[in-house]
Structures are given as C-alpha cells and as structure tokens.
Amino acid sequence: MTKIISWNTNGLRATAKQGYFTPLFKKYKPDVLCLQETKVEPDQLPDDVRNIKGYESYFSYSKLRKGYSGVALYTKEKPLEVFYGMGIKKFDDEGRIVGAKFKDYTIICGYY
C-alpha cells in the first residue's frame, strides 16, 4: 500500500527550524509527502530540507511574491513525469500545483 501524507506547513523554513520537518520522514516513512504553503524561494531552502535521503523532491514557487504560497512533493520512487500548474496563469504563477505520474497512479499536490 502507498503511504501518502499531506501537510499544510504554513512556512516550510519555520517548520524545519523548529525541528518538525525531517523527523516526519523517519517516524512515518511516507512514500509520498505533499506540502502546501511552503512560502520559500529556491535559494532559501537549506540542503537538509531540499535533499532528504531516499527521496526525490519537487517544488513549485510563487513567481509573483517572495515567500508566498508554494507547494512541494517528496517521493521515494522517481516519477515517470513531474508537472507544474493547472493551466490557469493566476494560479500557476502563484506556485499552487505540483504533480507526479507513476506507473500505477498520479498524485497532485495543490491548494488554494
């Protein structure tokens, strides 16, 4: 069975700094972790948050405002395809969707 966790972090940097982020992987061992409201820019992510051993990570950032919205997807298995957005410019520019296609399923991490 595939174990999927979804979490609205309301700020990934703060969540990680408080020590809540990386222990999640050890405790629950999710196959897929979907994060909403990451509120980070690519250059603000520490390596230990971006690169979790045994996981692929994919981030969708807001192009309109720094530190606003954003979603992320961590997967144990490398996806066949990763996609960003839903074809609606306003939402796509806010970094609200990241998805991945696997052999047996597709997962979409998003929020509004």
Predicted features and spans:
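Structured beta-strand-rich core segments of catalytic domains in phosphoester-bond hydrolases
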Residues: 39, 47-112
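N-terminal, active-site-proximal structural segment of metallo-dependent hydrolase catalytic domains
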Residues: 1-52, 63-68
